[in-house]
Amino acid sequence: MVMRAKKVFVVVAYDVSDDRRRSHVVKILEKVGVRINYSVFECLLTDVQFEKLQNNILGKIKPREDTVVYYPICVDCYTKIVYQPDSRRKYEKVSVV
């Protein structure tokens, strides 16, 4: 029996003032998530991936100038997400961390 790591659905929003730093943040997020708006990504991550994502982004931003916010979404709230228009990818399974 193969055990799979539980995953958490996370919405990541950022405000990065410098084009170069912002480009680095976008490249990191594009590897693990889906862009749903100019500065917002949805990600389905294990705990290890989530921690790594935060560390990778922290290494690319200037905390006094930039902001990145991570919103973990519980299963109950995830099922209530509304997209207008409904064209976004829905993840198959979401687990609470």
Predicted regions and their residues:
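Basic nucleic-acid-binding interfaces
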Residues: 2-11, 17-97
